[in-house]
UniProtKB/Swiss-Prot annotation:
GO terms for biological process: translation. Belongs to the universal ribosomal protein uL1 family. This is Large ribosomal subunit protein uL1. It is found in: Cytoplasm.
């Protein structure tokens, strides 16, 4: 366990979050979010960090993904009912900013074949990149379903201009153990990205979408 957040604290907070969500049943699956508040950090001067870490349990089961594929990848995607678009479909968007923005909004992430990935900025313009959804590379040696699972369970920490971050680390249908594992992994990874590690952390909370925040640190 990470030195600054004890195992007991973590389990207690997770228990509170899960019990809170059981008391008030929602019509949707609540996400559990890790909220981080930083200190001694100047977003203007200090390097803005970003990094990704793969969790054990997928934080968002409803995560939607689209394959921008060559013929083979489109066929593979079709076989497993995954949304996909080929180069012709992308060209039809005609670099129209509104349409590209709509595409970026429609999916949580994209995978693209090697032959397409280099052409995306030229065909679509900067829209996907601006939305923070530039596709991950999909090669032919990779199993499509495994790659999709990997993308679904990977979370990204990205420092913007403000000193607080929030990332989805799970949902309320996960077990205590699964949530604790995901949160523990996320905290350790985040702290490793910070210049002064724990000295940059002001506070850590976890909360479900509609629940009360529980303080970890």
């Amino acid at each position: 366990m990470s030195s600054k957040v004890s195992r007991d604290t973590l389990y207690e907070a997770v228990r509170e979050v899960l019990q809170g969500s059981k008391k008030k049943k929602r019509k949707f699956l609540e996400t559990v979010e890790l909220q981080i508040s930083l200190k001694n950090y100047d977003p203007q001067k200090d390097k803005r960090f970003s990094g990704t870490v793969r969790l054990k349990s997928t934080p968002r089961p409803k995560f939607s993904l689209c394959v921008l594929g060559d013929q083979q990848h489109c066929d593979e995607a079709k076989a497993v009912d995954l949304p996909h678009m080929d180069i012709e479909a992308l060209k039809k968007l005609n670099k129209n900013k509104k349409l590209v923005k709509k595409l970026a909004k429609k999916y949580d992430a994209f995978l693209a074949s090697e032959s397409l990935i280099k052409q995306i900025p030229r065909i679509l313009g900067p829209g996907l990149n601006k939305a923070g959804k530039f596709p991950s590379l999909l090669t032919h040696n990779e199993n499509l379903v495994a790659k999709v699972d990997e993308v679904k369970s990977t979370i990204k920490f990205q420092m913007k201009k403000v000193l607080c971050l929030a990332v989805a680390v799970g949902h309320v249908k996960l077990t205590e153990e699964e949530l604790v594992y995901n949160i523990h992994l996320s905290i350790n990874f985040l702290v490793s990205l910070l210049k002064k590690n724990w000295q940059n952390v002001r506070a850590l909370y976890i909360k479900s979408t509609m629940g009360k925040p529980q303080r970890l640190y």
